[in-house]
Amino acid sequence: SVRVNDWTTEWTYLDVIEVVSGAGANLDCIMLPKVQGPEQIRALDMLLTQVEKAEGLDVGRIGIEAQIENAMGLTMVDEIAAASPRVETIIFGPADFMASINMKSLVVGEQPPGYDVGDAYHYILMRILMAARAYDKQAIDGPYLQIKDLDGYTRVAERSAALGFDGKWVLHPDQIAAANEIFSPRQDDYDHAELILDAYEWYTSAAGGARGAAMLGDEMIDEAS
């Protein structure tokens, strides 16, 4: 993906033309920052279509990653996710978002001082995640700027992974291994999932009694499992 300037600048259309004209055949997505509404996604979609046609590329081959970085973008995130089939990913941009809502923290991604009743980012992350899941998009958490604080990166990455996010940005090579480990299935989870599938297949078969639900140890399993 290539990040272009947002639509509030005078450079966006030139960025898109230059990037797609120069590297369109090897380009997967354009990342659009500071998205505030579906009209900005549709505008990028139309521009991409024109440049793809001009360059002889298959129309629609280049996706869009929409970054949510302010309050307006969050309130419109459902419409943004649904704005175009090109949209593949919804990304949280914590630094600009914190500034846009006047959050009292100077460390991006960390809890604001004085707020000790929960996670100040929980609503934001869940709002983005629900829109992404409702419209079958990826949900990606944004960067952690304290690149030397690997424990801090791990802590906030585990938070978004626990909610169901598909990944988190890395800004430094030291963060890569942590991101891969956190957002990859654990072997224990994989093995347990295999047991559930095997047990469900057996118990729903004629030989296993053709049951709709069964027990796997102390756990009830059914189609939803």
Q: PLM ranges: what are they?
A:
Residues 1-225:
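Expand to "…catalyze enediolate/carbanion chemistry for C-C bond making/breaking, isomerization
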